[in-house]
């Protein structure tokens, strides 16, 4: 592991002419390294003339530490060990909420360090303990403005089964599936396997509450299904078994509208994979983040005008059905018959240089830096009332 230790970076005095943004990344989930890579992209892109940045890392143990403002040290690379934030044995950092806003206290080499007023928190946490409504709930309790979806949408977007329930209620198609509950597999595995007989092969077995394609397996034969369920259960005890959908993988970036305006939708993009260059059979972790030469981001997607309109309209409907705010990426399968089937909703999509979300907005006319600024400004004007 490449450890990024908190060694006491200097903290600038608050600049009253700038908005103070705490960029929070790392975290306790298995996507810790991906979160650091996302932070690297955002720290490189954020407008330093408008925003004063406090880079705050969360260790895998849950400690909050101030780290050096060095995006290169956070980047994901297949030529070095994964990045991990450490606190070198220090205690817990805290975010407090005095009257009038949030005040951040993190760990220093000699004890707690008060960083002062924070205007906005930009949580770049992927997976559990970050993207699932946990940090959002903490910030809501303290009335601290933050970027992205609220508690409910974050929690629903994290749980693929709950997402399907909400989308189904809105009349939006998803893949046929069977839920393997946390205790059901241990209690009666044969009942689960029998239920899965109604699904069409190949099957995709995935953790219900994880991202970055962690723990996902493609299953071609019934005899391989139990092992695939165990692989997914190692990431999350709640598992989803889905029928494979034959279709092109199309992704859509959605951005909250200003005021009461409708959600804004970027040009759809798609993933083109070259297995001869190291891509897997599907868009797994290695293909997504390490096999850069094997993956091409195509935007606009190579689809017709009717399909484009359908995909964009469905993405906006899905965004609102789940109650998203700020941003989300809606992933589709576009079948040969022209049906748009939602695969998942990602409420904190990756912002790495290899991520499709910022690229789709760039193609649509909103550059990386302006996109980050827009997200921060949306958070600043959003009510901190939990019933907004």
Predicted feature descriptions by range:
Residues 18, 32-40, 48, 54-181:
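Conserved N-proximal alpha/beta basic substrate-recognition cap immediately N-terminal to
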Residues 54, 239, 243, 250-251, ...:
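A short glycine-rich, hydrophobically flanked beta-strand micro-motif that places a catalytic Asp/Glu
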Residues 137-146, 221-226, 363-364:
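A glycine- and small-aliphatic-rich helix-loop capping segment at beta-alpha/alpha-beta transitions
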Residues 2-20, 25-28, 48, 302-388:
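ATP-dependent carboxylate activation and anion-phosphoryl transfer catalytic cores
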Residues 59-62, 100, 256-261, 335-338:
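Short acidic-glycine loop/turn motifs at beta-strand connectors
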Residues 220-313, 339-341:
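Phosphate-binding site of ATP-dependent enzymes
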Residues 2-24, 29-30, 36-40, 53, ...:
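Active-site nucleotide/adenylate-binding loops and adjacent lid/helix of ATP-dependent enzymes
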């Amino acid at each position: 592991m490449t450890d990024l230790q908190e060694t006491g970076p200097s903290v600038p005095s608050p600049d009253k002419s700038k908005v103070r943004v705490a960029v929070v990344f790392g975290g306790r989930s298995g996507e810790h390294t991906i979160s650091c890579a996302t932070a690297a992209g955002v720290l490189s892109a954020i407008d330093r003339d408008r925003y004063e940045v406090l880079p705050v890392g969360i260790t895998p143990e849950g400690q909050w530490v101030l780290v050096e403002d060095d995006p290169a040290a956070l980047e994901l690379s297949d030529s070095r060990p994964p990045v991990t934030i450490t606190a070198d044995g220090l205690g817990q950092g805290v975010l407090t909420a005095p009257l009038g806003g949030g005040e951040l206290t993190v760990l220093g080499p000699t004890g707690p360090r008060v960083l002062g007023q924070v205007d906005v928190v930009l949580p770049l946490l992927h997976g559990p303990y970050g993207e699932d409504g946990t940090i959002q709930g903490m910030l809501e309790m303290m009335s601290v403005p933050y970027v992205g979806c609220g508690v409910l949408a974050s929690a629903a977007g994290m749980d693929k089964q709950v997402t399907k329930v909400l989308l189904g209620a809105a009349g939006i198609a998803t893949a046929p599936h069977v839920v393997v509950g946390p205790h059901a597999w241990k209690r009666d595995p044969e009942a689960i396997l029998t239920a899965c007989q109604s699904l069409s092969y190949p099957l995709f077995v995935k953790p219900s509450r994880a991202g970055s394609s962690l723990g996902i397996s493609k299953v071609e034969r019934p005899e391989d299904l139990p092992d695939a369920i165990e692989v997914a259960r190692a990431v999350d005890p709640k598992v989803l078994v889905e029928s494979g959908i034959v279709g092109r993988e199309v992704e859509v970036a959605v951005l909250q509208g200003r005021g009461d305006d409708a959600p804004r939708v970027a040009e759809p993009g798609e993933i083109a994979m070259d297995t001869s260059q190291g891509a897997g059979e599907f868009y797994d972790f290695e293909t997504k983040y390490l096999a850069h030469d094997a993956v091409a981001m195509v935007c606009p997607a190579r689809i017709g005008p009717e399909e484009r309109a359908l995909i964009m309209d469905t993405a906006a409907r899905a965004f609102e059905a789940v109650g998203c705010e700020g941003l989300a990426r809606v992933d589709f399968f576009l079948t040969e018959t022209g049906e748009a089937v939602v695969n998942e909703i990602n409420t904190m999509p990756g912002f790495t240089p290899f991520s499709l979300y910022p690229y789709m907005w760039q193609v649509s006319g909103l550059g990386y830096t302006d996109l980050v600024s827009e997200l921060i400004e949306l958070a600043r004007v959003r009510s901190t009332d939990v019933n907004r």
